[in-house]
Amino acid sequence: MRKIQPSIVLVKSICSPKPREELNEVQLNEAAHLILAGEGVINPPILLKTGMDPHTGLESYSVVDGHFEHYAAVRGREINARKGETINAYVIEAEEDEKLFMEQISMFRDRGRGTTAPVATSS
């Protein structure tokens, strides 16, 4: 179906295959405070809808890209459970579409992380 939806997602319904211990806790804490202050994240994580969690009855998601943003949101929820309850994210609806969006991630996000050199203009 090739669809990706901007969504507001409960932080507790997201899991990441990347361990939190691999990330810098000081930076996560700083990012968490920025997310709480801005009431959102400027670089939303990309999530794959994985189904219904049998324990909570909530839709569940797995991080495809944006593990740092996800764990910063988790830290934000630890700091302030009410303000950090949700995060804006892009949600891939179907697993068969993950490969297509991974190609986009590779092209748009991994390509220098937006740090390309300015283009010279002639006068």
Question: PLM features: what roles do these ranges have?
Answer:
Residues 1-85:
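Short, charged/polar connector segments at secondary-structure boundaries
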Residues 81-123:
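Amphipathic, charge-rich alpha-helical segments that serve as recognition/docking helices
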